[in-house]
């Protein structure tokens, strides 16, 4: 993090008017200075219902089928859902990672390690792949358990059902 920016933020927090409420959001709060964190109250925001995110996307002009898919993929996070609308490459990368997973499942160990080695060279891509794969395995485990919880990867329902069937 940039020290000058962090110090400016700290000064803003310390000198804010008494009536002011500042909301600070961070994807990686561990990168904030401890002095900043100590002056904040941490609120963990829960995702919105999928239906609310879907309705918001429809209101913004997204067709119903796409809005439903993006709302599920977003996991109830409206900001992420809007980014999925604005940046089609996010959905393309997600599909790529899920296709990679399908290819790797029956692959030989050497191919899996080769893929892992390639992925380890790009930390952002690795983090992205792990996040996407975790959502996929979450869906599989929900189906194995017989839970009625909505899937994140609704567009992969047939694959998920098939894999869940093999695991029971």
Give residue ranges: language-model regions:
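Conserved catalytic/switch belt of AAA+ P-loop NTPases
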Residues: 7-21
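Conserved AAA+/SF3 P-loop NTPase catalytic/coupling segment centered on the Walker-B
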Residues: 1-10, 29-33
């Amino acid at each position: 993090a940039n020290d000058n920016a962090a110090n400016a933020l700290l000064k803003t927090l310390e000198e804010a008017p008494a009536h002011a409420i500042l909301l600070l959001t961070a994807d990686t709060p561990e990168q904030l200075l401890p002095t900043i964190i100590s002056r904040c109250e941490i609120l963990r925001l829960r995702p919105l219902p999928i239906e609310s995110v879907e309705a918001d996307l429809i209101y913004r002009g997204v067709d119903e089928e796409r809005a439903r898919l993006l709302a599920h993929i977003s996991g109830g996070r409206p900001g992420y859902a809007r980014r999925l609308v604005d940046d089609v490459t996010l959905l393309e990368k997600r599909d790529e990672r899920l296709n990679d997973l399908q290819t790797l499942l029956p692959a030989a160990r050497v191919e899996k390690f080769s893929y892992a080695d390639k992925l380890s060279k790009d930390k952002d891509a690795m983090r992205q792949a792990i996040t996407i794969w975790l959502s996929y395995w979450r869906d599989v485990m929900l189906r194995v358990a017989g839970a009625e919880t909505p899937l994140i990867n609704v567009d992969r329902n047939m694959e998920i059902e098939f894999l869940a069937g093999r695991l029971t």
